Amino acid sequence: MADSIKVICDTLGGPIRVAMGTPLSDVAARLTPGRYPFLAAFVNNRIKELNYKIYTPVTVRFVDITDFAGIRVYQRTSWFILQKAARTLFPGHTLHIRHSMGQSGFYCELEGLDEFTHEQAAALEGHMLSLIHI
């Protein structure tokens, strides 16, 4: 393989060779699927998204939702989707993600709204799902 680089994949348990510029998603596709999909990977101990391309020899460890880093990736992604949906449905209002409510989620406020109804919550959830095409 011309211009190939060595990737030490902790998830695989050994090294593999890939072409320069290979995205992490392609490396992940070589792995036996686990119970949960991979959300990101540590590349030389730094968290990277799956479209990150590899150009030098690296050590990779993929993470899923069972890993603390995977939970954080999932949370941040959910926050971006929530922000996008809130801006679309409630223009002129600012969504604030205030603090953690333990394993129940996060406390949020929409600035400028005195009341947030069940119908508005359902519309927000529906728009979030449409953004990710579910």
Predicted feature descriptions by range:
Residues 116-120:
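Glycine- and Gly-Pro-enriched alpha-helical subdomains that act as flexible
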Residues 1-79, 84, 88-105, 123-127:
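Ubiquitin-like/PB1-type beta-grasp interaction modules and other compact soluble beta-rich domains
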